[in-house]
Amino acid sequence: FGERGYHDAAIARIAQLADVAIGSFYTYFDSKEAVFRALVDSMSAELRLAMTAVIVAAPDRLAGERAVIAAFIEFCRKNKALSRIIAEAAFVSEDAYRRHYDKLAKSYAASLTKAFGRGEMSDGDMMVRAWAIIGMNIFLGLRFGVWDESADPAHIADAGIALISEGLRPR
């Protein structure tokens, strides 16, 4: 799916790459859409686990947010198909697409709420904040992780965390 897109991907090729017979493929999945949904769910879970580990390892929430920006750019560089597969899911399997972002936003908002409880950030609508930060990270990952790898992720993370922590207010 990552190389050719959903519509050009063939079950025979998927089975060949997975080193299974086509009949065995149908033991686990009843259609190409079913395997695509499973792939979206799997990639989504892998992404959430990777970014959660980065946040948890940080000394505080703002340091964690900065680390997540850099880590997400690196994740996108190593998993270039992720952006394409998730974007395609909007058209192929809207339920998987929405589930990906809904789970991500809910876990992110819960994590922000915990950080507020520890006194690491201000109060506010954590769900709105989660969606805003996720949106920023998605486009930073696309631009600097998938389209062009020349920028240093640390530099991008510095600019991103400045926006998160200071906003656009003049200093």
Predicted segment positions?
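Helix-turn-helix
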Residues: 2-34, 38
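Amphipathic alpha-helical packing segments from all-alpha helical-bundle domains
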Residues: 45-52, 75-78, 94-120, 127-132, ...
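Amphipathic alpha-helical segments used for helix-helix packing
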Residues: 73-95, 139-146
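C-terminal effector-binding regulatory domain of bacterial HTH transcription factors
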Residues: 171
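Short, basic, alpha-helical segments at the C-terminal edge of helix-turn-helix-like DNA-binding modules
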Residues: 11, 41-47
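Hydrophobic alpha-helical connector segments
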Residues: 38, 52-78, 129, 133
